Amino acid sequence: MMMTMAADYGSSEGHYDTPWEFLARPNSVRFSTADVRLSTSAAGDAKVSPHGSPSLCSSSSFVNQLVQIGNSAVDARRKVPRDESKRRRPSDSEIYMEQNMNRVEAEKRLENRNLGDYLLRSRGEGSAALSLRATKGVVHIKIEWNGEKWVIGEGPLFRSISSAISFYRRHPLPIRGADHLVLKNQLKPV
C-alpha cells in the first residue's frame, strides 16, 4: 500500500503554506495573527497569551519575545532588525588626505609616532602616497589609480583608497621596509 505525501500531512494542499522547518520538526508551533492576541487593560498590566491563558504570560517579557512578521508571530531572537547606523562601512569620507605635504614634512610628523601610524598625502591627479612609521624610520608607498582601481605599491587592486586602508588595517603590508606592519592610527591633517 502506497501512501501519498498529502496523506502524510493530513490534506492535499495544507502543507504548501507550512515552512519546511515546521514540517521537519513536529514539536514546533506556528502562530498566525489570529492566534496571537496580545492586549492590555486600561492599567496596562493584563496580557493574554497566544493560547488565551493570562497566567502563561503574566510577565511583561512575553510581549518582547514575539515579533509580528507578516502573518505569523516569530520569536524575537530569530529576527531582530539591525540598526544600520551602527554598522561600520569604510568610505572615502573616513580617511584624511594631506593636500600640500611633501615627504620631508611627512617624515617630521611621523618621526616620534608609534609603529604602524600613517598619513595619506595627495600627489596630484590619480596619485597619492602612504607615509608609514616603520621600524627603520618612515616609509613612503605610492598609491596609484590604474584607470579602474587603486593599487598600493605592488599589492592587490581596490575600488577606493578607503577600502585599501581598511584592508591593510587587518592584513600586513607586503612592502619591503614596512616589516609586514598593519596600519594602526591615521594622523589627522594639521
Curated annotation (Swiss-Prot):
SUPFAM superfamilies: SH2 domain
Residue span, SH2 domain: 96-190
Keyword set, alphabetical order: SH2 domain
InterPro entries: SH2, SH2_dom_sf, SH2_domain_adapters
Tissue note: Expressed in PQR, but not AQR, Q neuroblast descendents.
Subunit structure: Interacts with abl-1.
Role according to the record: Functions downstream of migratory protein mig-13 and may play a role in the control of Q neuroblast migration during larval development.
Name of this protein: Protein soem-1
